[in-house]
A protein has these predicted regions:
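Charged, gly/pro-rich, cysteine-poor intrinsically disordered low-complexity regions
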Residues: 14, 18-99, 105
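Sequence/fold signature of self-assembling virion shell proteins
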Residues: 62-159
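Alpha-helical scaffold segments that mediate packing/assembly in large oligomeric complexes
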Residues: 1-36, 145-159
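Long, contiguous amphipathic alpha-helices that act as assembly "spine/axial" helices in icosahedral shell
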Residues: 1-13, 38-49, 53, 82, ...
Length: 159
């Protein structure tokens, strides 16, 4: 679900599939992303969902050239929770109210314990099958905003 994979007959599209991710490299640009979501009258609790690489970049990104304060402090950006996950595509993030995503499951979860396929390796194979899909509740473009994080350009002393 957190990938950029296109959907198919046997798996749903990831939430990063088919979206154009705007590149950000400064705290000011990140504030503009938050403003776009706020302008959509999103009422729920907003969160950031990002890759571990995006989190690492934001942990090193200063809020401005006049401060040593960093964009990501602990596990939040100005009090907004940040969730980092290795399933999110490299340097990408999503920001918004994730309660606007509904997941559905159909039928039972099938669990198969196969002691034969890997018997020569003294192992068992476990197969789990489930029918799952997800959709946004609101079609508004800015309920959840997508982007990519890049390291800020190095500043030249005296400029």
């Amino acid at each position: 679900m957190l990938s950029a994979d296109a959907g198919g007959t046997n798996k749903p599209a990831g939430i990063f599939s088919g979206v154009t991710a705007k590149n950000i490299s400064s705290y000011a640009e990140l504030c503009n992303v938050e403003a776009a979501v706020d302008d959509s009258n999103v009422k729920g609790e907003r969160k950031y969902l990002m890759s571990n690489k995006a989190k690492a970049i934001l942990r090193c990104m200063p809020k401005s050239s006049l401060t040593t304060e960093l964009v990501l402090d602990g596990n939040d950006i100005d009090g907004t929770p940040v969730i980092a996950n290795s399933d999110v595509p490299t340097t990408q993030y999503a920001y918004g109210d994730f309660s606007n995503i509904v997941m559905g499951t159909w039928g039972n979860v099938d669990l198969i314990i196969d002691p034969y396929t890997l018997a020569a390796e003294n192992s068992i194979r476990i197969v789990v099958n489930a029918f799952v899909d997800w959709k946004k509740v609101r079609k508004d473009e800015n309920v959840i905003v997508y982007g990519k994080v890049s390291a800020p350009a190095a500043s030249t002393p005296g400029k």
